[in-house]
UniProtKB/Swiss-Prot annotation:
Binds to the 23S rRNA. GO terms for biological process: translation. It comes from Rhodopseudomonas palustris (strain BisB18). GO terms for cellular component: cytosolic large ribosomal subunit. Gene3D superfamilies: 3.100.10.10. Residues 1-41 are annotated as: Disordered. Residues 21-37 have a biased composition (Gly residues). This is Large ribosomal subunit protein uL15. It comes from the Bacteria. Pfam families: Ribosomal_L27A. Keywords: Ribonucleoprotein, Ribosomal protein, RNA-binding, rRNA-binding. One of its GO terms (molecular function) is rRNA binding. Belongs to the universal ribosomal protein uL15 family. Part of the 50S ribosomal subunit.
Length: 162
C-alpha cells in the first residue's frame, strides 16, 4: 500500500448543497427558504417566537428581584489561612485583615468585605479583622488562641447601588 492509495470511504464526505443556482438544481429560486417574508430574509428571526403560541418566557411566572443593597463578600476558609501562614505569605504575628490578605495574594480582591468560613483546621494563633464570620470559624480561631474582630461592612455608594 502506498500513501497515494489512501482514500476516504465512499460517502463519508458529502459536498455541500449550493443553493440558488438555477431551477434544475432543485434548490433554485427561493433556495429552500420557502416564500417571501421575514423568515426568507437573512439574519432576521424573532427570538422566542413560537408561531403565535404564547412563548415559554411569557408563560412562566416572574420570580424574585435584585436587591441593590446586597453586599458581596470575599470568602476565605480557615484551611486557606493556615496554608498561607505555613507558606509564610502571611505574617501570623500581626493583624490579618482584608488589606493584608489582598497584599499577600491570598485574596484577589476584598469586594465589599471579607467573610471567614470554618472549613479546615487552624493551628496558628491569629488576630483577624473581618466583616463577617461563621460561628464555627470564630470557635476554631479562639480554640487556637487567636481573636476575631467583626467589622461593620462598608456601605455601597449611592452611585453604585442605582
Amino acid at each position: 500500500m502506498k500513501l497515494s492509495d489512501i482514500a476516504d470511504n465512499a460517502g463519508s464526505r458529502k459536498k455541500r448543497m449550493r443553493v440558488g443556482r438555477g431551477i434544475g438544481s432543485g434548490k433554485g429560486k427561493t433556495a429552500g427558504r420557502g416564500g417571501k417574508g421575514q423568515t426568507a430574509r437573512s439574519g432576521v428571526r424573532i427570538k422566542g417566537f413560537e408561531g403565535g403560541q404564547m412563548p415559554l418566557h411569557r408563560r412562566l411566572p416572574k420570580r424574585g428581584f435584585n436587591n441593590i443593597f446586597r453586599l458581596d463578600f470575599a470568602e476565605i476558609n480557615l484551611d486557606r489561612l493556615q496554608e498561607a501562614v505555613d507558606a509564610k505569605t502571611i505574617d501570623g504575628s500581626g493583624v490579618i485583615n482584608a488589606e493584608t490578605l489582598v497584599a499577600s495574594g491570598v485574596l484577589r480582591r476584598a469586594k465589599d468585605g471579607v467573610r471567614l468560613l470554618g472549613r479546615g483546621e487552624l493551628k496558628a494563633k491569629l488576630t483577624i479583622e473581618v466583616h463577617g464570620a461563621t460561628k464555627t470559624a470564630i470557635e476554631a480561631v479562639e480554640k487556637a488562641g487567636g481573636t476575631v474582630k467583626i467589622l461593620a461592612p462598608a456601605k455601597k455608594d449611592e452611585g453604585e447601588a442605582a
